Amino acid sequence: MSKYSDAKELAGLTLGQKTEYSNQYDASLLQPVPRSLNRNDLALNGELPFVGHDIWTMYELSWLNTNGLPQVAVGEVFIPATSQNLIESKSFKLYLNSYNQTQFENWDQVTERLTQDLSACAGESVIVNVNSVTDYTNQPIVTMEGDCIDNQDIQITSYDFEASLLEGAAGEQEVEETLHSHLLKSNCLITNQPDWGSVEIAYSGKQIDREALLRYLVSFREHNEFHEQCVERIFTDIMKYCAPSKLTVFARYTRRGGLDINPYRSTEQDRPSHNKRMARQ
């Protein structure tokens, strides 16, 4: 359990509560969660050691045009890691549902409204793209870059989070490599529901022992934090124990409630080169 799971900032969230579903536009449904909650726990109190974005994909986005004809789209939202807040996912879903029976003049108006409301909730300007289903149909399903570290013949008996599993994981050889795992699983901070993801780790520096890295990632299996918080924890732990000169951590989680969340943190560029979905998304 995370140290801040009982924080007062989480007490009023709709997550884990019985809620009414509104089909009329209502921006007040959005609920922020201060990023400072987990960053204080990670001693990230000053300048951040990374840049990045939380990339959300909205698969259940629909509204009415001025003739009352339903419109459907697939949307993308890029929320800067520097924003004051992350957006709580159930409130995001309820907010999107409030578009369902609301008329908008055109697609641009929908994009503008989403941008305005999500920026206000995050506390910083976000980027929103609204795509037609036809355009999105041509997007390929991709796999992660680099070597998969999952097929190791190792025995694991503990699933309690333990950052120190990375202690001594940095070897002597200098490398630049990309590794990935599909075994990332954590639990929702509030509801304890499982969150399933894949994570790509690109770095330059002392070569990281793959067994130690896999054991570390598997230790998230019973850990309770939001997606974004887990990725920042992975980033800071690798920096602490392995000290690479360059590091990028990019996780892609399976969708829930018509939304998937793909946090990206890096010492290099502030967003990935693409937002293409994986087989489990």
From Swiss-Prot:
The Gene Ontology terms for molecular function here are:
preQ1 synthase activity
Per UniProt, substrate binds at 87-89, 227-228
- List the InterPro entries hit by this protein, alphabetically: GTP-CH-I_C/QueF, NADPH_dep_7-cyano-7-deazaG_red, QueF, QueF_N, QueF_type2
Coiled coil location = none
**For the region Disordered, what residue ranges are annotated?**
261-281
Which Gene Ontology terms of cellular component type are present?
cytoplasm
Q: What is the main EC category here?
A: oxidoreductase
Q: Would the keyword NADP turn up in this protein's UniProt record?
A: yes
Main site of residence?
cytoplasm
Q: Which domain of life is it from?
A: Bacteria
Q: What is this protein called?
A: NADPH-dependent 7-cyano-7-deazaguanine reductase
**What species was this sequence derived from?**
Vibrio atlanticus (strain LGP32)
Per UniProt, what is the name of the gene that codes for the protein in this document?
A: queF
